[in-house]
């Protein structure tokens, strides 16, 4: 299966609005950005309809538009991956999206081993980066969604180095 994992084998023709993969059996999984895309489109529809205050919760991706009706920021809790009934912190947010990726909700167990859904493209197995979850806050929905997954796979040191090198999340 790893022979079929290579993003360089995806060809995109923007003029024709077409994409192709080099080998039979290859697939594109948009799971790392699908909710970000949906949130972006939903926010645009709300704003186009005149909406100025809303919270969209897409399960792991939360978008806040404006402030609450009383003018205060939206308060968004970040789940504790060790105890999903509680939270690590509560963030006061306005006009941003928050995306959390982790292996604590979508998984299966086989022979006493837990396998979560975030795959490391280098190994073909669930990412084992030492992180339990990553939360990214940004005005860019797709960026937040993609980075929460990518930084989860990357691990703590690489994720922190990347975060320190940027100013857009």
Features from the language model and the residues they span:
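Mature catalytic core of soluble alpha/beta enzymes
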Residues: 1-169
């Amino acid at each position: 299966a790893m022979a079929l994992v290579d993003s360089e084998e995806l060809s995109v023709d923007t003029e024709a609005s077409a994409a192709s993969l080099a080998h039979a059996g290859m697939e594109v999984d948009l799971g790392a950005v699908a909710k970000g895309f949906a949130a972006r489109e939903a926010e645009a529809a709300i704003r186009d309809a005149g909406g100025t205050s809303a919270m969209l919760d897409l399960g792991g991706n939360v978008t806040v538009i404006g402030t609450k009706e009383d003018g205060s920021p939206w308060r968004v809790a970040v789940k504790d991956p060790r105890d999903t009934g509680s939270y690590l912190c509560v963030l006061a947010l306005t006009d941003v999206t928050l995306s959390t990726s982790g292996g604590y909700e979508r998984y299966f167990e086989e022979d006493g081993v837990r396998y979560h859904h975030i795959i490391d493209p280098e190994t073909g197995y669930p990412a084992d980066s030492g992180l339990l979850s990553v939360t990214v806050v940004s005005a860019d929905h797709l960026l937040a969604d993609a980075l929460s997954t990518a930084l989860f796979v990357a691990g703590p040191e690489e994720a922190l180095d990347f975060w320190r090198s940027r100013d857009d999340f």
